[in-house]
Amino acid sequence: MTSRDDILSGAHARIEEIFVDHKRFRAAYRRFDECRASFGHAAEPECLLVMGSSGVGKSTLMRRYLLNTPMQRTDEGLQVPVLTATIPVPATMKNMAASLLDRLEDPLADRGTLLQKTRRLRRLLKECQVELIILDEFQHFIERDSDRVILDVSDWLKNLISETAVPVVLIGLPSAKRVLVANEQLRRRFSAQLHLEPFGWGDDASRDEFRRILNAVDLALQMRQPSGFADFADRFHVASRGLIATVMKLIRAAAHRAIRENAPRVELRHLARAFDERVFPEDRRPNPFLDGWDGSVITTPDPEPANTSVSIRKSTGRKPRLGDNLHA
């Protein structure tokens, strides 16, 4: 018999695992595929710069793409078709090279000079049959605020691409573009650029896609009753400024609370409380999830019930849904 804790644990885990693909991500995946396909076939590898503000899904994009191209171990050794790394802090070329070497399972990833690390990296890129490199948080180099660092990074990256012919995707804040400005040859290689923007409300297509995402998340929650997120998409847009990361942060927090209350669906009061607790103070707007919200004030939402009981439903052979009424 499944225990109450197991059922609740599974419900909460599914909330965290929810991911909704959408048109913008699928378009970005195609661009990644095009870069990867250029390896070994095009005269020059096709590289791409992906830019966007925090919360538009840049890092999620990289993680999800990697799920479809996992590393494999064969009789010939480790194969890593897509090599990814997040630029560490402090951002130095040695640290970046070490991070890439570590992903290629180099036991000496942290050792040696930059030249030695770069030589090992070139060798391992070939041995592991790497077809695409994706570097996330590339703006960390810009945050060093040193023209010398930017010039050195741009030269190192340009040479790596030239010597290995492996296409590279750079992901970062718009400030990452400064690396390209510093090097004409590198700027030419990264002439293809993709800007990820928050979902707008004034554009019909963007607004409709935003609603579709909310509806898909609603279905994925598997509550006993639909929460109707798409019906108050305008509230979500005000709360999130069109950033899907903020939307998911609010929905996850609200869904966890609804589960704890044994509520059949996520209600506005759950979202109102999540907004108060999860939105950074400097980003605060009038709480759009309050009843009668007029966009002018923030009012504390109703407190959660003082007494909440959860019990266990006898097994029916059906996988429990989020928010199931669990009784003995």
Language-model regions, residue ranges each:
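Post-Walker A helix-loop "phosphate-sensing" segment adjacent to the P-loop in P-loop NTPases
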Residues: 67-78, 106-107
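C-terminal alpha-helical "lid" subdomain
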Residues: 2-7, 55, 203-204, 212, ...
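The catalytic "switch" region of P-loop NTPases
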Residues: 142, 153-231
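A short hydrophobic beta-strand->loop->alpha-helix junction that borders the nucleotide-binding pocket
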Residues: 80-91
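Mid-core helix/loop region of P-loop NTP-binding domains shared across ATPases and GTPases
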Residues: 4-10, 29, 92-96, 107-156, ...
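Walker A/P-loop nucleotide-binding motif
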Residues: 44-63
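Charged, amphipathic alpha-helical linker segments immediately N-terminal to NTP-binding catalytic cores
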Residues: 1-23
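Pre-Walker A adenine-sensing motif
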Residues: 29-41
